[in-house]
Amino acid sequence: MNQMQEIIIDKVVVNIGVGQAGDRLTKAAKVLEMLTGHKPTQTLAKKSVRDFNIRKRLPIGVKVTLRKDDAVNFLNKALYVKDYKIPDYSFDKHGNAYFGISDYTDFKGMKYDPDIGIFGMDVAIVLKRRGGYRIEKRKIGKKTIPSSIRIKKDEAVEFLEKNFKVSVVR
């Protein structure tokens, strides 16, 4: 295979959606910082929802974006929690994978802290090819990536099975 067609991990995004600002949000940020070692950023509400008492641009969650070695290390920890099994429906048609972890205490070495409580999280794995993806991100001369270069679902499944020993449950 051409080395520019090789699939690599672009980023791993870890998200905790709290749904409200305040004390629970700071606790969720503390959990993410303990797990990843990076300072999380707040996610804001896109629109107001009266039933949930959420206003537009109100912080309602925290997330951390991990790249390169940090992404691979955290992904190994997260897949260990899931017993290296991901369901087939977790992959989208562009080769990205998403799964949830119900409790942060499932991670190796993490103990329950009654001051923090229980927080689950969503993990998103974004894959890309080594070459060719810059044309979609650059400022001048942007173009869409041809479908022949885009990562297919089957290629993403094969990448995770080969590199992380993940079994995809169908």
UniProtKB/Swiss-Prot annotation:
Q: Name one GO biological process term.
A: translation
Query: Which superkingdom is the protein from?
Result: Archaea
Q: Which GO terms describe its cellular component?
A: ribonucleoprotein complex; ribosome
Which keywords belong to this entry? Ribonucleoprotein, Ribosomal protein, RNA-binding, rRNA-binding, tRNA-binding
Read off the NCBIfam families from this record. Answer: PRK04219.1
Task: Tell me how this protein assembles.
Answer: Part of the 50S ribosomal subunit; contacts the 5S rRNA and probably tRNA. Forms a bridge to the 30S subunit in the 70S ribosome.
Q: Which family does it belong to?
A: Belongs to the universal ribosomal protein uL5 family.
Question: Under which name does UniProt file this protein?
Answer: Large ribosomal subunit protein uL5
Q: Which organism is it from?
A: Thermoplasma volcanium (strain ATCC 51530 / DSM 4299 / JCM 9571 / NBRC 15438 / GSS1)
